[in-house]
Amino acid sequence: MIAGPAALFADGQAESDNCVLPSHHAGVSFPLDQVEKAWACRLQPIISHYTTATKIGSERTPLPQDIFLYLLDHPVMAAALVNRLDFGLYKAEQRGPQDFWATDGEGTEGTIHPLYQEGSTRMYFAQGSHDGRLLPRVTGKAVVLLQLHPVTDGRGIESIDSTLVAYLRLDNRLLSGLLSLLRPLIESVVHRQLLKAFDAARLLGGAMREHPEKVLFEATDPPALPDEEVAFLKAALMSLHNPTLSPGPTP
């Protein structure tokens, strides 16, 4: 968990007049200059006046980059597999051509808009709510920055190391007076929720490598996943057990 002044996360202060966003966050570079100006002006107050700022990683997922990216860019499919394999209570639904809604099934839900999806970098805007046992219901907006790095271990197993930086700004004015007291608790909740998502991804990757038949069964058990996703999954599972094969390009 990262704490302290905003300077620790951003090299230079974003200029509110033209909504220029810094490119360095917690020691990692992100191409925020590629974000459309209208979006940049929505992100600027979240990054400059965050409630919490969190860095996680690197976290390893035992999947090659092409398979990992496909699942990352198909969150409805990924959430369904995690749920059916009992790795979590995640659910996701497409909301329009780009946005999707997601819940962890334990009080956190929201809509997510992809801002940038190129190469090994993903950047998102999220807005949602958390209703848990330790906190009153809170709503807020977040900027989520994700950097991926493919690695191969000594056994030749391809994996992805992920580093995530997230800025959260709460909407609830009633909490502003208590923020100094609640901040450690809020930071703990955010950190736990993000780690839980990485754990689910790691478990899914492990199942795809070690129990491909079970993964495919869950994907095709009625109601089956869409045909194109099942086709990719079949090819991906085959490639994991025969590295000379490739699951094909990521649509």
Language-model features: locations:
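Bacterial N-terminal signal peptides
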Residues: 1-6
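Coil-to-beta-strand transition motifs
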Residues: 51-52, 121, 155-159
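Extracytoplasmic/periplasmic, Sec-exported soluble proteins
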Residues: 56-64, 70-73, 134-136, 182-189, ...
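A mature extracytoplasmic/lumenal domain signature
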Residues: 72, 83-86, 96, 104-106, ...
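Glycine-rich portal/gate segments that line the openings of hydrophobic small-molecule binding cavities
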Residues: 91-143
